[in-house]
């Protein structure tokens, strides 16, 4: 698999099908989370905790990659995440509605593993559309 295929498979199969035992095949023990200019060591365990937290909020969520770009070792993936809102999320009470949230992930892949992960999700549009947040 090339880098784009690896990242797409990771999100659409490993993450979407909750195959957390497979994480060590795709995530480096030295994987960092990039937030702006800061990085935080998360490794396999940190990625697992992140995915478990998402599954508490959206137990059936899946990810669909709709576009990808590559620059050196970085794979930029535009995605749609779809799942039923069944758990509390940043103080928002579960709605049991199926929500679709768009986003972009930026993953650095070295030697067949993700060594750096970052990105952003556009929760505003979805939450506004479903009246989970209101204008001020």
PLM ranges: what are they?
Residues 1-136:
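C-terminal and inter-domain tail/linker signature
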